[in-house]
């Protein structure tokens, strides 16, 4: 009988997931007031016994806390109309808090010659809504220090380390006209500068007020110095780097000329109080943008042409409506955004496994050939989301047909399966969060060894103000598995017995002898039987 020995070593499956939240994947390009980045993540589950993994795309990131900060920095002269729009945004945020159970913190700064914290950054509740509304309506007078207002707002946002930077919003409402500034981030004490009265054709010193600009430039009440706001701001920055700027000229604002004549500006090329105030305001605004905060500049009213132009410059060269800000605070991306996802070369997408949820609600779907519709009537003319699969390329396009809420992540899941027969040995690299490091280590992932569930997944976002954002790449989860080979061994060969001729002959002789005796006995027995019968 043939013996077959089969040995099987145990299989060990290891898989990783990868997640990239907005802000953790670096993006190139200048920070702008528009769509800067979009929170997003992509994860994969551990391979099961059939070498399958569930991949999940999420907008915003599934790992992100659904908490936001909103700080209003309001000019003392903010109109009642804009205050009402701010209150409408506040009411909508209150609905999100009530309906979705999310956390939104709100702060209010009112500024004149200094910044006044009318309401510290506090979690929005039904109980404090009225108090916040009163803070927004608060009126004060005397002075205009935009730098102070932004410093106070920035401090609020900086101090809250529990909220992701891109979920921090600063809404700056001003006419852009300013002539006071602060030193060493102290937003409670205003400073100014003043030209020597001899430079003023009218004679008297202007006491560090807005009128100092009239000493420096002619016709400034109806025009922009240097021909445009961009030229002027560039010129100011250049002079700030020369001896046309000196901190010794700064003095605490009192409404009077400096008591020390050495502080008086003697040259019209010197950086004036208005110019330094504008420069520091813009620098603080940009610093917040570079920190990832979403800053929104809204023109409160038109007083001076250069003030209006300055606010539009902060807003990216365009006027910003309060309604568009409200949309940005509430939503991550708008209708028309798409995701193009290509499955990894080592995997195949498993048909019929798409699943989509909004918040905690799983949407109904209908599959029509290679197209799957989610939500609405689930057809080509009425759907919330659509997925079109390309079998030849093993890729799909996800179309988003509604704004995606910052407070209710949209998650698309599907299953991939390892293509072909698992090869013996260890393959892939564990990278559960897609940060480029092997899980639970500080070791960089070797991309040549990674086993990516996807070749790529690209988000092409539409901003909430309708603008087209730059393409953003999702992370690529990498998985790992270890499989043993099957071993087969031939059965042992039969033992061949060698019989010598002598032994063989003796054996035959014995056999013949025994046979002969047996035969003789049989004959004898037969004879006896025959006689008895007779």
What are these language model-derived features?
Residues 80, 114-152, 157-160, 177-180, ...:
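Short, charged loop segments at secondary-structure junctions
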Residues 24-71, 78-84, 488-490, 494:
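Acidic, polar low-complexity linker/tail segments
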Residues 130-134, 167-173, 229-362:
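Von Willebrand factor A/integrin I-like adhesion domains
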Residues 518-534:
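C-terminal membrane-anchoring or membrane-association module
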Residues 15-34, 500-501, 525-530:
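Sec-dependent signal peptide cleavage junction
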Residues 106-108, 122, 126, 345-394:
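A surface/secretory-pathway sequence property marking extracellular, secreted
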Residues 390-453:
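Low-complexity, intrinsically disordered segments enriched in Ser/Thr together with acidic residues
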Residues 63-123, 149-153, 164-174, 178-180, ...:
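Von Willebrand factor
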């Amino acid at each position: 009988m043939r013996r077959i020995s089969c040995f099987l070593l145990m299989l060990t499956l290891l898989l990783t997931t990868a997640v990239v939240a907005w802000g953790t994947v670096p993006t190139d390009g200048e920070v702008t007031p528009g769509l800067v980045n979009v929170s997003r993540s992509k994860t994969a589950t551990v391979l099961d016994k059939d070498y399958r993994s569930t991949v999940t795309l999420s907008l915003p990131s599934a790992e992100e806390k659904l908490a936001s900060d909103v700080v209003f920095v309001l000019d003392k002269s903010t109109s009642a109309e804009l205050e009402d729009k701010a209150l409408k945004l506040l009411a909508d945020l209150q609905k999100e808090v009530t309906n979705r159970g999310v956390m939104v913190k709100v702060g209010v700064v009112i500024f004149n010659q200094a910044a006044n914290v009318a309401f510290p950054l506090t979690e929005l509740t039904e109980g404090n809504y009225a108090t916040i509304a009163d803070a927004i309506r608060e009126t004060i007078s005397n002075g205009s220090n935009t730098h102070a207002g932004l410093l106070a707002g920035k401090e609020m946002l900086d101090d809250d380390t529990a909220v992701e930077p891109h979920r921090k919003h600063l809404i700056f409402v001003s006419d852009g006209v300013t002539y006071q500034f602060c030193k060493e981030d102290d937003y409670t004490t205003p400073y100014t500068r003043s030209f020597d009265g001899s430079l003023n054709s009218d004679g008297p010193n202007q006491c560090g007020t807005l009128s100092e600009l009239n000493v420096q430039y002619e016709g400034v009440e109806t025009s922009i110095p240097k021909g445009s706001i961009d030229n002027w701001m560039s010129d100011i920055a250049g002079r700030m780097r020369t001896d046309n700027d000196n901190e010794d000229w700064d003095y605490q604002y009192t409404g009077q000329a400096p008591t020390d004549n050495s502080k008086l500006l003697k040259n019209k090329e010197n950086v004036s109080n208005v110019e330094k105030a504008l420069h520091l305001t813009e620098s603080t605004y940009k610093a917040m943008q570079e920190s990832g905060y979403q800053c929104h500049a809204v023109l409160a009213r038109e007083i001076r042409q250069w003030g209006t132009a300055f606010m539009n410059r902060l807003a990216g060269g365009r006027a910003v409506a309060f309604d568009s800000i409200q949309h940005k605070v509430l939503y991550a991306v708008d209708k028309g955004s798409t995701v193009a996802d290509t499955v990894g070369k080592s995997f195949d997408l498993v048909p019929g496994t798409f699943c989509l949820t909004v918040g905690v609600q799983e949407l109904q779907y209908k599959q029509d050939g290679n197209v799957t519709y989610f939500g609405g009537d689930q057809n080509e003319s009425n759907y919330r989301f659509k997925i079109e699969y390309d079998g030849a390329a093993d890729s799909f396009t996800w179309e988003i047909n509604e704004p995606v809420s910052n407070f209710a992540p949209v998650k698309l899941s599907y299953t991939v399966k390892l293509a072909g027969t698992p090869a013996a040995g260890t393959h892939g690299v564990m990278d559960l969060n897609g940060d480029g490091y092997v899980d639970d280590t500080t070791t960089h992932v070797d991309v040549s060894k990674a086993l990516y569930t996807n070749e790529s997944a690209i988000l092409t976002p539409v901003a909430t103000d309708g603008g087209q954002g730059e393409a953003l790449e999702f992370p690529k989860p990498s998985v790992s598995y270890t499989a043993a080979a099957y071993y087969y061994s031939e059965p042992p060969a039969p033992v061949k017995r060698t019989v010598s001729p002598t032994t063989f002959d003796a054996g035959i002789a014995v056999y013949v002898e025994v046979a002969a005796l047996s035969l003789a006995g049989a004959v004898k027995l037969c004879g006896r039987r025959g006689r008895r019968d007779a």
